[in-house]
């Protein structure tokens, strides 16, 4: 494999969460019209709908702390699957919420875009 999918996953993850935590309205260029986001139970398609959902989330400040990051090649075409778990600190909360997120990244010229994005909060049973 010529591509280092682990390095790609690390770079993408750092960029995505830094951008999300500072100004999530700017995440639109990572998605395309065919992209899909499943956020908890909501499914949205297209960059515009996805960004509208992310911007509408009911918090002002957010910080993601990554606990695990796993990546695998997802097809012979260079697709990459990325799975992240971590903690989410919202506004002035002191107790983080656990989350999981999966990205399916598709090559697009010299970069990648998010084809699938699945986000889920992990509540203890």
Swiss-Prot record:
User: A Gene Ontology molecular-function term?
Assistant: small GTPase binding
Q: Name one GO cellular component term.
A: cytoplasm
- Entry's localization field: Cytoplasm
Q: State the CDD domains in the record.
A: NTF2
A Gene Ontology annotation in the biological process aspect, one of them, is: protein import into nucleus
The answer to whether keyword Cytoplasm applies is yes
Where the record annotates domain NTF2, the positions are 8-121
Pfam families assigned to the protein according to its UniProt record, in alphabetical order = NTF2
User: Keywords in UniProt for this one?
Assistant: Cytoplasm, Protein transport, Transport
Q: Which domain of life is it from?
A: Eukaryota
| InterPro entries, A to Z | NTF2, NTF2-like_dom_sf, NTF2_dom, Nuclear_transport_factor_2_euk
Q: Specify whether Transport is a keyword of the entry.
A: yes
User: Function of this protein?
Assistant: Facilitates protein transport into the nucleus. Could be part of a multicomponent system of cytosolic factors that assemble at the pore complex during nuclear import.
What this protein is called in its record is: Nuclear transport factor 2
**The organism of origin for this protein:** Candida glabrata (strain ATCC 2001 / BCRC 20586 / JCM 3761 / NBRC 0622 / NRRL Y-65 / CBS 138) (Yeast)
* Gene name in the database record: NTF2
